[in-house]
Structures are given as structure tokens and as C-alpha cells.
């Protein structure tokens, strides 16, 4: 889809490999085997890369409950909150589960639990919306998160007390 190349290339585009490799931080050990980047996918330099990857979709998506679980949905910019988080981490080489099966429930059991006072950009934050842990996003700092929301698609939203998501934040923070 040539019209998508300006947005960082989509799977199947000529520039896809280059677009993905700019986020890859893996190394090769002395024995010649690949190693996993240290520091995980969030709360580190990789956390900033996850945010940068996610920000490329701001204004280019729409929220569809259950969306983002097929390549055609992704190509069309249809995501829900959990599929967006999965997509952003996938862009930096962090696998948080299969494309077809990601939910807030599968994301909340992964990674390391972090005290909300210790949140860093790239950490994953959860909200009690229509159910416990019903919404998820990526913390960007300054009490804000990047997520795919119903009215905005992918956007940055406030977690300040007194705002919708600020009042729904349940304190669950995970670092992948």
C-alpha cells in the first residue's frame, strides 16, 4: 500500500524491513546466538521507542472493539486498546502474545509489576472501565498515557485525578 509508506511502512511494503529494523536493539553474543535486549521493552530506552512507534498512529486510527487482530484491521487502522499496545511493542521487537488472542486480561499477566510511584515512560497502565482492567495504554510521562480510545482512536490522554481515565486508573502497572 504505497500511500502508507509515509507513515513508516506497512507489512508488505518495500520499506517494511527498514522501518522495523530501526527499532531493533538485539545483539549477538560471543557464541553467535542472538540475545534479548536487557532492560525490557518498557521503562527504559526501549520504552521511549515503544512510545515513538505508537505515536506514529495518532490521528490515523479508529477504535473498534475487538479490532487489530488481523493484518487487514491493522492496515486499515482499526484497533482496540489491547491490540494497539501489542502492536506498539511488536514494533520494537517485544512479543506480548499472539495477534489473534491479545486482551487486557492476557496483557495484565505479563511483565513485571511496578509500583505506580515508579512508573516510567513505556510502562503499561490499566484502567477499570467496563470491567476490572477493561482498558490499557502506554505511560508516556507527566501523568499521561498513549492508548486507543473509543472517541479518539490512538491518542494521548490524561491520567490526572478528576479526568475520566485518571479516575479509572486502578494502579496496575506492568513493565515488559
Which residues fall in each region the model found?
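Catalytic Cys-His active-site segments of thiol-dependent hydrolases/isopeptidases
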Residues: 97-102, 138-163
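Non-catalytic cell-wall polysaccharide-engagement segments
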Residues: 1-49, 168-176
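A generic structural signal for residues embedded in beta-strands
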Residues: 126-127
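Extracytoplasmic/secreted proteins, especially bacterial periplasmic and envelope-associated proteins
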Residues: 12-23, 46-53, 80-87, 91, ...
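Sec/Tat-exported extracytoplasmic proteins
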Residues: 1-2, 20, 24-31, 54-62, ...
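Structural signal for conserved beta-strand scaffold positions within catalytic alpha/beta enzyme cores
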Residues: 56, 65, 147, 158, ...
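Catalytic cysteine-centered active-site loop
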Residues: 62-121, 155-157, 166-170
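Short, Lys/Arg- and Gly-enriched loop/turn segments at beta-strand edges
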Residues: 131-139
Amino acid at each position: 500500500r504505497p500511500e502508507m509508506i509515509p507513515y513508516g511502512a506497512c507489512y508488505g511494503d518495500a520499506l517494511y524491513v527498514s522501518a522495523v529494523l530501526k527499532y531493533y536493539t538485539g545483539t549477538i553474543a560471543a557464541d553467535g546466538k542472538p540475545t534479548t535486549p536487557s532492560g525490557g521493552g518498557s521503562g527504559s530506552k526501549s520504552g521511549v521507542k515503544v512510545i515513538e512507534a505508537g505515536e506514529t498512529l495518532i490521528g490515523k486510527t479508529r477504535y473498534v472493539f475487538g479490532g487489530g487482530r488481523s493484518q487487514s484491521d491493522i492496515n486499515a487502522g482499526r484497533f482496540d486498546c489491547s491490540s494497539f499496545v501489542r502492536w506498539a511493542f511488536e514494533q520494537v521487537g517485544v512479543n506480548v502474545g499472539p495477534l489473534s488472542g491479545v486482551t487486557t486480561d492476557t496483557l495484565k499477566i505479563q511483565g513485571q509489576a511496578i509500583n505506580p510511584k515508579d512508573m516510567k515512560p513505556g510502562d503499561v497502565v490499566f484502567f477499570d472501565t467496563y470491567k476490572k482492567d477493561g482498558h490499557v495504554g502506554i505511560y508516556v510521562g507527566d501523568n499521561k498515557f498513549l492508548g486507543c480510545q473509543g472517541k479518539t482512536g490512538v491518542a494521548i490522554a490524561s491520567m490526572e485525578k478528576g479526568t475520566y481515565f485518571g479516575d479509572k486508573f486502578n494502579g496496575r502497572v506492568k513493565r515488559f
